[in-house]
C-alpha cells in the first residue's frame, strides 16, 4: 500500500477535488491519498465524490481553524 500526500491548502474549490481525482486516478486499489485543504466546500464535495466512486474515507479531521485532512483509500 502506498500513501501519497496532496497539499491543496490555499486552492479554491473546485480545484482540491479536481487534483484529488487526478492523483487517485494514478494510484492502485488499496493505496491511500491524504488530502490537506482549506476550502470549506471541499468538506462536503470530497467525501461525496469518494462515496459515489466507492472509495473509503479512512480518516477525516480538522487541522487548525479552517483546514482539514481527509484520507481516501482507493477502491
Swiss-Prot record:
Pfam families: TusA (PF01206)
Upregulating conditions: Member of the CysB regulon. mRNA levels are increased by disruption of the rppH gene, which encodes a RNA pyrophosphohydrolase.
InterPro entries: TusA-like, TusA-like_sf
Catalytic residues in the record: 13
Knockout mutant characteristics: The tsuB-cysA double deletion mutant cannot grow with thiosulfate as sole sulfur source.
Origin: domain of life: Bacteria
PANTHER family the record matches: SULFUR CARRIER PROTEIN YEDF-RELATED
Similarity field: Belongs to the sulfur carrier protein TusA family.
Primary role: Involved in thiosulfate metabolism.
Protein name as annotated: Putative sulfur carrier protein TsuB
Taxonomic path: Bacteria, Pseudomonadati, Pseudomonadota, Gammaproteobacteria, Enterobacterales
Recorded name of the encoding gene: tsuB
Amino acid at each position: 500500500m502506498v500513501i501519497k500526500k496532496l497539499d491543496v491548502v490555499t486552492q479554491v474549490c473546485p480545484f482540491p477535488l479536481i487534483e484529488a481525482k487526478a492523483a487517485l486516478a494514478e494510484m492502485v486499489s488499496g493505496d491511500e491519498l491524504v488530502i490537506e485543504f482549506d476550502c470549506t466546500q471541499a468538506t462536503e464535495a470530497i467525501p461525496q465524490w469518494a462515496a459515489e466512486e466507492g472509495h473509503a474515507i479512512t480518516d477525516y479531521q480538522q487541522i487548525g481553524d479552517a483546514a482539514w485532512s481527509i484520507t481516501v483509500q482507493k477502491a
